[in-house]
Amino acid sequence: MFTIRHKGLRISPSLSATRELMKEGKTLFDVLEILEKGYDAPRKRKHGIIEKWINKGNKTYNVVVAEDYDDIMKEDIWKLIHFGKFTRRRIK
Protein backbone atom coordinates (compact mmCIF):
# COMPACT_ATOMS: atom_id res chain seq x y z
CA MET A 1 0.00 0.00 0.00
CA PHE A 2 1.30 3.47 -0.92
CA THR A 3 1.67 5.82 2.03
CA ILE A 4 3.29 9.18 2.57
CA ARG A 5 6.00 9.02 5.24
CA HIS A 6 8.17 11.53 7.08
CA LYS A 7 11.17 10.27 9.10
CA GLY A 8 9.91 6.72 8.63
CA LEU A 9 6.44 7.36 10.08
CA ARG A 10 3.19 7.52 8.11
CA ILE A 11 1.36 10.89 7.99
CA SER A 12 -2.31 10.60 8.93
CA PRO A 13 -4.53 13.73 8.98
CA SER A 14 -7.14 14.42 11.64
CA LEU A 15 -10.67 15.23 10.48
CA SER A 16 -10.24 18.97 11.05
CA ALA A 17 -6.84 18.98 9.31
CA THR A 18 -8.41 17.15 6.34
CA ARG A 19 -10.99 19.93 6.09
CA GLU A 20 -8.23 22.56 6.25
CA LEU A 21 -6.30 20.79 3.46
CA MET A 22 -9.42 20.60 1.28
CA LYS A 23 -10.21 24.29 1.88
CA GLU A 24 -6.73 25.26 0.62
CA GLY A 25 -6.73 22.69 -2.20
CA LYS A 26 -3.62 20.94 -0.86
CA THR A 27 -2.69 17.27 -0.41
CA LEU A 28 -0.47 15.22 1.88
CA PHE A 29 2.31 15.61 -0.71
CA ASP A 30 2.23 19.36 0.02
CA VAL A 31 2.40 18.59 3.76
CA LEU A 32 5.43 16.36 3.16
CA GLU A 33 7.13 19.12 1.13
CA ILE A 34 6.61 21.63 3.96
CA LEU A 35 7.93 19.17 6.55
CA GLU A 36 11.04 18.43 4.48
CA LYS A 37 11.84 21.86 3.00
CA GLY A 38 10.21 24.22 5.51
CA TYR A 39 11.80 25.96 8.46
CA ASP A 40 10.98 25.70 12.16
CA ALA A 41 8.26 28.00 13.42
CA PRO A 42 9.41 30.79 15.75
CA ARG A 43 7.19 29.56 18.60
CA LYS A 44 7.93 26.56 20.78
CA ARG A 45 5.79 23.41 20.87
CA LYS A 46 5.69 20.49 23.29
CA HIS A 47 8.03 17.54 22.87
CA GLY A 48 6.75 15.28 20.08
CA ILE A 49 5.05 18.11 18.15
CA ILE A 50 6.62 19.66 15.05
CA GLU A 51 5.54 22.93 13.44
CA LYS A 52 7.10 23.91 10.10
CA TRP A 53 6.53 26.95 7.89
CA ILE A 54 7.29 27.59 4.22
CA ASN A 55 7.00 30.84 2.26
CA LYS A 56 5.36 30.89 -1.18
CA GLY A 57 4.90 34.33 -2.67
CA ASN A 58 3.47 36.60 0.01
CA LYS A 59 1.82 33.64 1.79
CA THR A 60 3.22 31.45 4.54
CA TYR A 61 1.90 27.90 4.92
CA ASN A 62 2.21 26.14 8.25
CA VAL A 63 1.92 22.49 9.23
CA VAL A 64 1.63 21.04 12.74
CA VAL A 65 2.13 17.30 13.27
CA ALA A 66 2.23 15.30 16.50
CA GLU A 67 3.63 11.86 17.24
CA ASP A 68 0.76 9.43 17.82
CA TYR A 69 -0.05 5.72 17.79
CA ASP A 70 -2.58 4.22 15.34
CA ASP A 71 -4.47 1.43 17.12
CA ILE A 72 -5.91 0.02 13.90
CA MET A 73 -2.63 -0.27 11.99
CA LYS A 74 -0.61 -0.91 15.19
CA GLU A 75 2.13 1.58 14.32
CA ASP A 76 3.50 4.95 15.33
CA ILE A 77 2.40 7.79 13.03
CA TRP A 78 2.60 11.54 12.55
CA LYS A 79 -0.92 12.91 13.14
CA LEU A 80 -1.49 16.07 11.09
CA ILE A 81 -3.36 18.32 13.51
CA HIS A 82 -3.25 21.67 11.66
CA PHE A 83 -2.66 23.07 8.18
CA GLY A 84 -2.91 26.81 7.71
CA LYS A 85 -2.04 29.77 5.53
CA PHE A 86 -1.50 33.41 6.37
CA THR A 87 -0.25 36.54 4.63
CA ARG A 88 3.12 37.95 5.58
CA ARG A 89 3.16 41.68 6.17
CA ARG A 90 6.01 44.08 5.69
CA ILE A 91 7.28 45.70 8.86
CA LYS A 92 7.35 49.48 8.47
What are the residue ranges of the model-derived segments?
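Ribonuclease/tRNase effector modules and their secretory precursors
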Residues: 1-92
